[in-house]
Design a protein with these regions (language model features):
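A short core secondary-structure module
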Residues: 1-17
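Residue-level signal for pocket-adjacent positions within structured domains
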Residues: 12-14, 18, 55, 167
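Short beta-alpha junctions and helix-cap segments that line functional grooves
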Residues: 20-24
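Glycine-rich beta->alpha junctions and the first turn(s) of the following alpha-helix
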Residues: 25-113
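Amphipathic alpha-helices that form helix-helix packing interfaces
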Residues: 69, 76, 83, 108, ...
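Hydrophobic/aromatic-lined pockets within catalytic cores
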Residues: 84, 88, 127, 164, ...
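A beta-strand-loop signature enriched in Asp, Gly, Thr, and Trp
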Residues: 87-146
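Glycine-rich phosphate/cofactor-binding loops in nucleotide/flavin-utilizing enzymes
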Residues: 169-180
């Protein structure tokens, strides 16, 4: 029926993207979501025969949630690295004095480890579950993958906020080695 979802592959010369609006990020770098109008035409052979629900459940759900979580972990790890550099530089400027951000740095390192462990647990769950196509389509597996995504996305916001607190204005500026 016309409401069924299908998965289709398009080659570069078979589609066009027309930008419809520009996203105003209000200072939030990395959140660009410009709007586009997608137009495409291709032979029917490029439509996957398998129902989209099966494709999504058996590969797309886990792959996208785990990939997003891993990317977010990388973003958070970079922010923590910059915060570490900031604290290290502060310690060098004032030997013998614990920099104010040192305690927050310990806290944020623990949070980063939590995200990493979450992603690894999700990867292991997927590796085990993908052996059984029925299990991949189960509600339990979908909840597990959603939990990986939600947990990762929520914790990295806290990590970024901690890194910004550690680096202060130098973390907000775009042209410093501590830019978050």
């Amino acid at each position: 029926s016309s409401s069924d979802q299908v998965m289709t592959v398009f080659l570069k010369d078979q589609y066009s993207l027309e930008k419809t609006h520009v996203w105003d990020t209000l200072g939030m770098r990395g959140t660009c979501s410009d709007g586009f109008l997608f137009k495409a035409e291709a032979p029917a052979v490029q439509i996957f025969a398998k129902p989209f629900a099966e494709i999504a459940a058996q590969s797309m759900l886990a792959t996208s949630h785990l990939l997003w979580s891993a990317v977010w972990h990388g973003i958070a790890a970079d922010a923590v690295m910059r915060a570490q550099s900031f604290v290290r530089a502060a310690a060098r400027r004032s030997p013998g004095i614990v920099p104010p951000g040192a305690i927050r740095l310990a806290e944020v390192s623990s949070k980063l480890q939590t995200v990493r462990s979450n992603v690894i647990a999700g990867l292991r769950a997927y590796a085990e579950t993908k052996k059984d196509p029925d299990a991949l389509m189960s509600m339990g597996f979908a909840v597990t993958m959603n939990n990986v995504k939600i947990c990762s996305s929520e914790i990295i916001l806290d990590i970024i906020n901690h890194a910004l607190l550690i680096c202060g204005i130098m973390g907000y500026k775009n042209v410093t080695p501590y830019s978050i």
